[in-house]
Every structure is written in structure tokens, then in C-alpha cells.
Amino acid sequence: MLFRSIWSQIEYQIPYATTSPQLFEALSEIGVSAISNAIDLIANGSTPTAQSGEVSIAAKVKKEECRIDWNASAEEILRKIRAFAFNPGVFSFIRGEQIKISEAQLAEGILAPGEISATGLVGTKDGAIQLINLTPAGKKAMPAKDWLNGFKPQQGERFE
């Protein structure tokens, strides 16, 4: 039976700051090699290896899971941004407007969780992140610095 059979397998170490779109691209390239290898094995009459362990299925991501909790650690927030950078995207609200954040990095700074500075630093439970790219509601993706030029955060203003 071919169910739960493995024809080809390649291990891949995911680099630290990889976003989901970057991972999809890398895996699509690696997949070509795996598929080619599997076709050769099938053509040569080889039998597949049985899968060990249980099958794991990822649950569907709910929209509310993509909302940033600024009381989380900077690392947790960055992981969420990288994981959902492309789809469905992580978001937060400020001044009642939804902002999707597609790229950020760890930064030094001491701000309250969710507090945003004029330079795009945002406070977290244990530090800060620097906004790099984002998408305001109804607009195209843009560098955070361009958004900040028009938005002009007030002292102590916070993402919700």
C-alpha cells in the first residue's frame, strides 16, 4: 500500500530569520530534487520506505492568531511575523487602523509593550522590535519609515 509511504526524503535546516515566502521558495527548489529521485526509484522498481510515527496535521490558522500580542516576547513576535509574513499576515491596530507587519527585526530599546517610537521601534514584553516593512489598511506594502513619515506617532502612543 502506498499510503504513508516515503519515496524520497531530504532534511533541511531552516535558517534563523527565514520568512514563510523564503521557506516556500527554498522547499520548492529542494522538492524538485526529491521528486526526481522518487521518479528514478519508482522507475527502477524500488519499494518505498514505510513512514514511522504518527501523521501530523497542522490546524488551520485563525485570523485572531495573527493579531500581535505586544505582551509577548520580541522573539515570539518576530517568529509570528516571519511565519505569517505572506499569508495570512500578522496585524495590529493603531488609531483604529489595521496595520499588517511583514518584516521586522530585533532592536534595542525600552518601551512599554505596543508603544511605538517616531523611528519605528515597538516595545514588547522583554525589549523591542524595529518595524521594516508594513501594509496600512487599504494601501500597498511600504517601508515602515515611509509610513512613519506620514503617520507621525505621538509620544507614548501604542498599538492596540
Feature roles, as predicted:
Residues 1-2, 147:
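Polar low-complexity intrinsically disordered regions
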Residues 3-107:
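Active-site-proximal loop/hinge segments within enzyme catalytic domains
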Residues 71-160:
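An anion-binding loop in the catalytic cleft
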